[in-house]
A protein has these predicted regions:
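Long, low-complexity intrinsically disordered regions
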Residues: 1-165
Length: 165
């Protein structure tokens, strides 16, 4: 994949980002304490590490929660740059397997989507090279701010903080 899609900008709004910019956002966000996974997030990330991806239905079973709580847990992990949408599949229902426009998403780690390593997702992935930013977290933030200001020169510092976290 060359494009990240998930809820990671403006406090959890859906967005697209190229690998170059997503890696820098990931580098910056993961350096901050407020973007560390909670207990539920850690359980989800362990399951993703073992299986390569996870769906909302699987999160519900794993945590024993309703759909809204599973959606919220996934959205937090997307905002923390821990998960991105890896795949979308159509849902076919009924005896004739009719498609009514419903789709289901699976979520994976950005490292599994963007890493150049030949290893498939799963438990052995821990031994492969992780996606590495080429900058320090503060340099990543500066890089992202400069890019946004080139596109939106009237953006304020407050706007940048709300956008990037």
């Amino acid at each position: 994949g060359e494009i990240a899609y998930g809820k990671f900008l403006w406090g959890g709004k859906a967005a697209f980002a190229t690998v170059e910019f997503y890696r820098e956002l990931m580098n910056y966000r993961r350096s901050l304490p407020k973007y560390q996974p909670d207990e539920a997030g850690s359980l989800i990330m362990d399951a993703v590490g073992e299986n390569g991806s996870i769906t909302i239905r699987e999160v519900r079973g794993l945590l024993g929660v309703k759909k809204s709580a599973a959606d919220a847990a996934i959205a937090r992990l997307e905002n923390q740059t821990r998960l991105v949408i890896g795949d979308m599949q159509r849902v076919y229902r009924g005896p004739d397997l009719h498609y009514n426009g419903w789709q289901t998403a699976s979520f994976c780690r950005p490292e599994d989507l963007f890493d150049d390593s030949p290893l498939p997702p799963g438990p052995f992935r821990a031994f492969s090279s992780e996606v590495k930013a080429r900058k320090s977290p503060s340099e990543s933030l500066s890089f992202l701010k400069e890019h946004v200001l080139r596109l939106a020169p009237h953006a304020t510092e407050r706007d940048l903080t709300r956008l990037l976290g």
